[in-house]
Amino acid sequence: MFKKLFGQLQRIGKALMLPVAILPAAGILLAFGNAMHNEQLVEIAPWLKNDIIVMISSVMEAAGQVVFDNLPLLFAVGTALGLAGGDGVAALAALVGYLIMNATMGKVLHITIDDIFSYAKGAKELSQAAKEPAHALVLGIPTLQTGVFGGIIMGALAAWCYNKFYNITLPPFLGFFAGKRFVPIVTSVVAIATGVLLSFAWPPIQDGLNSLSNFLLNKNLTLTTFIFGIIERSLIPFGLHHIFYSPFWFEFGSYTNHAGELVRGDQRIWMAQLKDGVPFTAGAFTTGKYPFMMFGLPAAAFAIYKNARPERKKVVGGLMLSAGLTAFLTGITEPLEFSFLFVAPVLYGIHVLLAGTSFLVMHLLGVKIGMTFSGGFIDYILYGLLNWDRSHALLVIPVGIVYAIVYYFLFDFAIRKFKLKTPGREDEETEIRNSSVAKLPFDVLDAMGGKENIKHLDACITRLRVEVVDKSKVDVAGIKALGASGVLEVGNNMQAIFGPKSDQIKHDMAKIMSGEITKPSETTVTEEMSDEPVHVEALGTTDIYAPGVGQIIPLSEVPDQVFAGKMMGDGIGFIPEKGEIVAPFDGTVKTIFPTKHAIGLESESGVEVLIHIGIDTVKLNGEGFESLINVDEKVTQAQPLMKVNLAYLKAHAPSIVTPMIITNLENKELVIEDVQDADPGKLIMTVK
């Protein structure tokens, strides 16, 4: 029961990232628009008083604020999209359902617009009168104040309706409403039922949330910030931190803005106070991230690099530099945290405690800095330094330096004292055992604990992604012995790095689990193994040319541990400068991943090359890519393979660095040319 709930919470947590991802853009508009009204800035730059500039800044401020004002609706649509695999019908159903749910609650409880503003009648101060109202005006609908929770509930229900009814068949005379068209209809019915239920169930829940909010924020806020920091970091490995911090950011606490509107949630209150130009009282649950993200974790990365074995320092240095810079600039810490989370849990325990103290120290010092994305340098500039007189952002720098020193010496001491297997200090890998192509999916399934142990099965171009029921049944060493370059464990989620064949293994495993294919007999396997084997290996010398116009970098500098660690093979990193990827040699297209972000090629001499366009671009679901070729198509060197929208990738992917990997280098030598500036006619590698 718990594991089932945990799996669902993981999916909800991932779904919440979609609406949260909108906030940085809205926050930037709001921050810049507000900064252009700042009196001190206007004194320095009087041209900001120009009517056109004032209008532009007002538009920017309003454009950013409207996003924060309508977060519940965005959470409804975003949650539905995330849980329904990105289908737009689910988003439409969530939008319709959210409106109907609110209208239903308003009618059942006879809420009117007069009720919404009755809190102000007879009150001495609006802020006192509207402190904890139970009602709200949502998109012009007088209804209960359910906040982002209402949006999440309706989004999850709309996704459930989609997954349940998207392929429903109806009688011929109702055929027009069959399939996906039925989803908004059934969601409307579910929304009415939900509205009626919440009309009676939500008020006591709301009272409980208000009581909890008052207790946490008013009884001992200092202790609360410390506990918040510890729990928030502790949930990172399980992917549940988004669920945990959402009530603090979007619901707990209240503030009445200058327009007389009630604003709830630490992050939303900070943004409202930014716009109103008043002293900041919010930010207790965001500010604590800045010292350890900008200073502490990069120092920890240096400690890990320092303790790597000499022969591994170059690779580890590239990984740690990339991860440390990412944490400093953007506040994205997972690449760095996951590098030591599972191999050295004691380090993560130290990190969690220090994160808690960071929130506590920032609160005690009265530093109040908001954020929309994460606690990196970019947010620090926008929400801290631009408002330094109100946020006290300058204090982050000396505090951060202290945290950098503490992180470095604690990590360095723990690594040496406990002989921790941090990156660059790992044991040698297990030797790979033979498994025929036909038998490999069966062996992997067995190593994962059998089909009864598989909760969810997926793959991308580089790794097999499996959510298991019981992690103790998984034979990690066995998976590595079957050819996986590495196995990453995140909670009950296993990622086995099988390279380009990962997707095929997934499809075969799915067919095995559904009974479509059966295990080959031992006789067949023996015959396969005893007959003269078919080797896919390069014959002679193969010249490999640049896959486009751009820059060549060492593979160790690619910002992804799987590629930089050469888990899939050796090669180079390519930074494209034009949106066209071309064939590096004459050969055949062997694979085009469904999301178009990766291409597998085989040269006429048998050299297999994987071109993986960007990092984590599988999550773009094909957006930004246009394939110009088909699987099994013959191509010539410099022939265009893929058109890429580089601007879109830069905005939506962690990096446009494109690993180019030779995946079958066994018994062959790879010579990498000393080339930096590349074009399709330039030789960059040779396989001998």
Curated annotation (Swiss-Prot):
Disulfide bonds: none annotated. The active site is at 460 (phosphocysteine intermediate), 612 (tele-phosphohistidine intermediate). InterPro entries: Dup_hybrid_motif, Glu_permease_IIB, PTrfase_EIIB_Cys, PTS_EIIA_1_perm, PTS_EIIC, PTS_EIIC_1, PTS_Glucose_EIICBA, PTS_IIB_1. The chain crosses the membrane at residues 12-32, 81-101, 137-157, 182-202, 223-243, 284-304, 315-335, 340-360, 364-384, 395-415. It comes from the Bacteria. The phosphoenolpyruvate-dependent sugar phosphotransferase system (sugar PTS), a major carbohydrate active -transport system, catalyzes the phosphorylation of incoming sugar substrates concomitantly with their translocation across the cell membrane. This system is involved in alpha- and beta-glucoside transport. This is PTS system glucoside-specific EIICBA component.
